């Protein structure tokens, strides 16, 4: 701990054994930052994959890690107070729209109580900037595309989305009351190497290779704003010093900056409409194997389509996603074949 003052800004990242958290931590470590990771390493999906991600991070001398639940305030408190970070990037959450229908209590504990604990500690140590992962699922039943940050988000259709919307409201109230600078990031369908096995593209790849059926909901008549992980992480990296300040006059069109708090919501996506069947077709081409398709009705909790407007993030940071989904799929499959050989 004695040498920390000689290093760059300290970054505390929750969810470092998870998909986005792992890549985010790796980005900051590669840039010379000191990173403290925190994760429960739960068994929602393959623990071996989570540990493999962590093993890579642990090779960095500037990486420290504590295993713990977000709900365990004592462990979280000890980690943050000891490290005293200037930036907190809160990416840990119970993910998955469909699982939230089966186990809503897990989402209440991790996403709401856990996020409350992080925000409370951020207030306590007077952080420079708290960045919290939200989700495009908060747009719910909205039918006006692309989604803008200033759009109303009153009709979530999954409990997962409801917990994410709740964290946004909770964060805004804390930011208003205690002047904690907070940015909420609404992620749009993130994919890529080291991804989550519960996500459709991961399941599709596994089943196509094993000659098993893939379930295609709503007969494939839907689209997503698939966003490659490197573009997501680049956006997060560029954002850390862009601290919201409501005392300044708004500089941007359609700015989501709060009138009463140093609080802003930002979309982070690829801004491209990718139809599900086109995505599957690309998987088939790269794998050189046809999928056995099973068409099913729309599933509970799923939204029909998503599409981001990221003009605000672009104006603030210069964010410019560069990865075409065809290239991103190739990179994912190359990793998948290597990891599961």
Task: Place the predicted regions along the sequence by residue.
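Short, surface-exposed alpha-helical segments at coil->helix boundaries
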Residues: 47, 51-54, 168, 202, ...
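Heptad-repeat alpha-helical coiled-coil signaling segments
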Residues: 189, 193, 222-224
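Residue-level recognition of oxygen-bearing side chains
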Residues: 75, 106, 113, 152, ...
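C-terminal substrate-binding subdomain of Rossmann-fold SDR/epimerase-dehydratase oxidoreductases
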Residues: 2-4, 27-30, 68, 206-341
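A glycine/serine/threonine-rich, flexible loop-to-helix segment
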Residues: 145-146, 197-205
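Hydrophobic alpha-helix immediately C-terminal to the catalytic Tyr-X-X-X-Lys motif of short-chain
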Residues: 166, 170, 174, 204, ...
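N-terminal Rossmann-like NAD(P)+-binding domain of SDR-like oxidoreductases, especially those catalyzing
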Residues: 1-190, 323, 335-339
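Proline-centered turn/helix-capping motifs that create local helix->coil transitions or kinks
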Residues: 131, 138-144, 179, 195, ...
């Amino acid at each position: 701990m004695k040498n920390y003052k000689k290093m760059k800004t300290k970054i505390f990242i929750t969810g470092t054994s998870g998909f986005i958290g792992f890549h985010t931590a790796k980005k900051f470590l590669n840039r010379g930052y000191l990173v403290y990771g925190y994760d429960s390493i739960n068994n929602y999906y393959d623990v071996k994959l989570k540990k493999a991600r962590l093993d890579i991070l642990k090779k960095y001398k500037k990486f420290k890690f504590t295993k713990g639940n977000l709900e365990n305030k004592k462990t979280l408190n000890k980690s943050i107070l000891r490290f005293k970070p200037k930036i907190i990037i809160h990416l840990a959450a119970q993910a998955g729209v469909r699982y939230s229908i089966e186990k809503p209590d897990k989402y209440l504990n991790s996403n709401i109580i856990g996020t409350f604990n992080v925000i409370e500690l951020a207030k306590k140590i007077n952080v420079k900037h708290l960045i919290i992962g939200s989700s495009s699922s908060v747009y719910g039943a909205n039918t006006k595309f692309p989604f803008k940050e200033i759009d109303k988000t009153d009709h979530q259709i999954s409990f997962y989305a409801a917990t994410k919307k709740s964290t946004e409201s909770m964060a805004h109230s804390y930011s208003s009351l205690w002047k904690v600078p907070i940015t909420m990031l609404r992620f749009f369908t993130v994919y890529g190497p080291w991804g989550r096995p519960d996500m459709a593209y991961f399941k599709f790849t596994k089943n196509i290779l094993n000659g098993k059926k893939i379930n295609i909901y709503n007969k494939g008549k839907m689209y997503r704003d698939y966003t490659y992980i490197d573009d997501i992480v680049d956006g997060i990296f560029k954002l850390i010093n862009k601290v919201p300040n409501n005392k300044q006059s708004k500089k941007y069109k359609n700015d989501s900056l709060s009138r009463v708090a140093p609080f802003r919501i930002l979309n982070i996506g690829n801004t491209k409409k990718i139809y599900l069947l086109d995505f599957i077709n690309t998987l088939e081409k790269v794998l050189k194997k046809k999928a056995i398709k099973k068409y099913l009705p729309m599933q509970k909790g799923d939204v029909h389509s998503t599409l981001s407007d990221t003009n605000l993030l672009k104006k603030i940071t210069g964010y410019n996603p560069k990865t075409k989904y065809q290239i991103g799929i190739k990179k994912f499959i190359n990793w998948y074949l290597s990891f599961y050989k």
